[in-house]
Amino acid sequence: MKDKIILVGCHGTGISTTVKALEILGKKVWKKPVDPKSGLFDKSNKKLESKFAPYDVFAGLPFSNHYKNFKDIFDDKCKIILTVRDPLDWYSEILSANKSKNEHILEQVFSDMEALKKSQKKKKAIQNYMDHNMEVIDFFAEKDEDILILEYGKHNKWKRICDFLGVDVPEDKYPKMKDDFKKSIFSLKSPLLF
């Protein structure tokens, strides 16, 4: 079975760009909606391996919330890429990407924010973002060869990704997807695709 690559960063951290880079490397990306409550991520689901077998890359929600299940099911065949950026820059990017939907999107990602007053949401969103990143890093503390942390805006991403995956660096320039991120993520109708 091929390695499974799970991108577990929050949106606004370079996930779309990283997906494009992985596609340039010939990786097949899952692009279908998934209901996280469907039981698809349950280890006892007999269809799981066959359903995911043709794909190499799984990005964003709900996959980023089920990386532990993937690691448990695919074990040594599962690699994690955590995309990160400065927390304040991340929050600003989410807000600037689409002001009319930002609150709704943050509440989808972090359900415990719904009841908060507007003044509390920024602090809570940033704390949730940092907690998510630390949880991922802590989970892989003993198997750090299975995780790559890519910081938004840093150079040498091709080399870091290719070294991590054990493939040659392509001649293509590393993609830039910021505008595509804003168009694609915030125009989705279904939260299951986000």
Where are these regions (language model features)?
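Amphipathic alpha-helical interface surfaces
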Residues: P54, H66-Y67, W90, H132
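The conserved 3'-phosphoadenosine-5'-phosphosulfate
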Residues: P33-K43, P87, I137-F194
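PAPS-dependent sulfotransferase catalytic domain
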Residues: E23-K27, K43-K46, K51-F52, K68-V167
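Short beta->alpha connector loops
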Residues: H11, L61-H66, K154-H155
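PAPS-dependent sulfotransferase catalytic core
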Residues: M1-Y55, L61, K182-L188
